[in-house]
Amino acid sequence: MVIKWSRFLVFCLIAFSLFIWMNTASSNASQGWKDFYKLPRNSVDVVFMGNSHNFETFQPEVINDLIPMESYLLGTSGENVMVSYYELKELLKYQQPRIVVLETFALDLSDLLAPSLMYEFLDASILNPDKLDLWLNYFDLKDAYNLFPALRLRIDWNQPADFFDSFIKTPGSYFNEIDERRGFLPTGRVMLPQEYEESLRLPGRESNYSLENNTHYLKKIVDLCRENDSQL
C-alpha cells in the first residue's frame, strides 16, 4: 500500500512539474514583466506605465545614464487605464517608486484593443486575486482554463520547432540577466500621414466599456500613489 501511494505521489509530482514547465514555455508574458520579478525589492525610483505609446517611447537605459536614478518601464499592448491600475497594484507589492509616470493614451482608450493582450501581464507570475479580478472584467468563468498558458496553447504542428526550442530553454530562462532595455521595445513601424488620416475615419469598435470607467480607475491610481508616497 505504501509503495502504491509513493508511486502515485511521484507521478503527481512529475505531472505537476511538467505542467509548470509547459505553462512557462507557452507563456505570453512580456520580457519587461518577466524581468520585473527579478529586480531587487524597492530598487526602482521611477516607473513608466502604459501601452505601446509608453514602451516604444521612454528608454530607461538612457534615462538612467542621464539622471542619477533607477527607472523601469511596464505595460502591455493596447492597455487602458483599468489595466494600468491593476499593474500598479502588482508593482507596489515589490517596489516603492518615488515617481509613477502614466502615459495619457491609456486614458483615451475606451477599452482594450484586444483583451487577450493582457496575458503579457497575467502570465508573468503566479495568479493572485488582483490578477483574477482584472481577468474577470473581460472573460467568463467558463473560460477559466485560459488562465493557464499550457491549456490555451495551440502548437503549429507545421512548424513546431519554435515551441520545442522555447520548451528546452525554459529552465535556463530563470537565470538570464535582466534585459538592459528594462522594458523598452524599439519599433521600426512608421505610419505615413495618409495612413493616419485614413485611420481616423475607421469606425470604432463596439464596446460596453464607458470612458467614465477610465476616470474611475484614474482616481484609484491617484489614491494608490498617495497611499504609497509616490508622485504621479
Task: Give the location of each predicted region.
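A short, structure-level motif marking secondary-structure boundaries and short turns
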Residues: V44-V46, L73, R205-S207
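Loop/turn elements at helix/coil->beta-strand transitions in domains of secreted/extracellular proteins
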Residues: S43-V44, M69-E70, Q96-I99, R226-Q231
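Alpha-helical scaffolding within the catalytic cores
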Residues: Q31-K34, E56-F58, Y86-K89, H216-I221
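Alpha-helical transmembrane signal-anchor/signal-peptide segments
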Residues: A25-V44
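Membrane-embedded segments
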Residues: M49, H53-L141
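Short, flexible loop segments at the rims of nucleotide/cofactor-binding pockets, characterized by
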Residues: M22-N28, M49-G50, T76-N80, Y209-L211
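Secreted/periplasmic serine-hydrolase-like ester/acetyl group-modifying domain
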Residues: M118-S230
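Hydrophobic membrane-insertion alpha-helices, especially the h-region
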Residues: K4-T24
